Amino acid sequence: MVGRRFVGLDGLKGIALIAIVLYHCDQGVLPGGFLGVDVFFTISGFLIVSSLLRRIDAGRGIGWGEYYLKRFRRIYPALLALIPITVAMAWFINRDMLVGIRNQILTVLLGCYNWYAISSGSSYFAQMNPDMFRHMWFMSVLMQFYLLVPIAVYVLLKSLHRWIPVFVLTGLAICSALSMGLRYHIDDDPTRVYFGSDTHAMGLWLGAAFAWALMLLRHGNGRVSETQLMDRIHARWGRIGPIAAFVALLALLWMMRHIGQGAMSVRFAIASASTLSVVLIAGSIPFGSWMQDLLVFRPLAMIGRYSYGIYLWHWPLWLLVRAVFPQWGARYADRTLAVTVTLTAVFAVLSWMLFERPVARAGFIALIRPTDTFDSDNGLRLWATVLVLTCTWSFAGYAVANAPAQTGVQTSLEANARMLQRQRRHDVLDRRKVPRPKRPVHTMPSGHQMTAIGDSVMLASSKGLQLSLIHI
């Protein structure tokens, strides 16, 4: 486990994040990369329910206040850095990106952007002027799950039979998958079923069910510790588990490469990706699993460890890079991807150092107050953080207040439409009767206006022509 529980999951998150970034930045490379979201959902459901059950098992209860405060501290620091910085950059680079930005920011912060996007008709699969924070639908679904899952755990703990919670959570996952498949019609935009918290929650509930099943297995083995349970699982399934996980990984990668948008992904691939993710988790978390050793590959694990910040920053930065270098287009998509990845790494690291880590350790007060010993490094971090927050939020507020209501292209098209409408009205008012031209009279030319040129046929006809057309 390398000093941490479920350390192999960082590698899984790294694989999922790479797939998502490739899909967003260059769909031709990985047309099914959006399935990485379902890997994330399954891992998130597993981890959050495991954490809650571990706390309950230790006799500390759910800890409602601590639970919600911890989630708040984990999610919002990076958001409070991302939003003003990217909005300010968009103001200088391409103000068309700020159309509708006020509602986007509000719904992102409230954790309901996915429903706003559905109601406003924003399509996840559209490429023309997409929302700057369109990728935040994922975080909105996750935030809503975080809000509800402790309530679900509290209720399910009252069950008469200890396996009922597993069946209920699995049933919720199946209902979500069926709802997605039944609500989707081939001719429809899949955004409703893809963004919906009700239709795209199979991975979350399936991960939660697996976490609960693991807890029951622990209790069924004489209430052993998590470490002892993993040892026993590895002893019994040491060969089969990693092999099954490896096959699941290959199947998942194959789907990401070959299954794109459409009915197949909505009705089959998303549910399959969630199920395969459970197999991946099961085969990679036991101690001694060679699959875990594979997934702790350092670069992959590092990407997974900082996946939240990378996910937040990559999409708006990609839009900004496209706006700065429009001449690259699809032909040089690799250049756009390279610049985006570089900038994402820089901003994700700075966000972690200046915002996320201090708040996770000491709360939001850490953003404006250094640690106990005020040395030069702490002072520098303090003033850098205060300066960045003040400047970016001030200018972002100005940019939001003065954001355009529509894109430049839309404004130009509407202006042209109004001009054509005025021209039509003018033409109607100026319409006058035009005299009909006289019918032309065609007369037969006389012989002296003709010249006959030919061979023996013409020579044989010359007498008749001279009689009919005098002076030819």
Q: Residue locations for each model-derived region?
A:
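Catalytic nucleophile-elbow at a beta strand-turn-alpha helix junction centered on a G-D-S/GDSL motif
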Residues: 448-463
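Hydrophobic membrane-embedded alpha-helices
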Residues: 2-9, 15-398
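Conserved small/polar residues in nucleotide/adenosyl-binding loops
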Residues: 470-472
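N-terminal secretory targeting modules
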Residues: 362-451
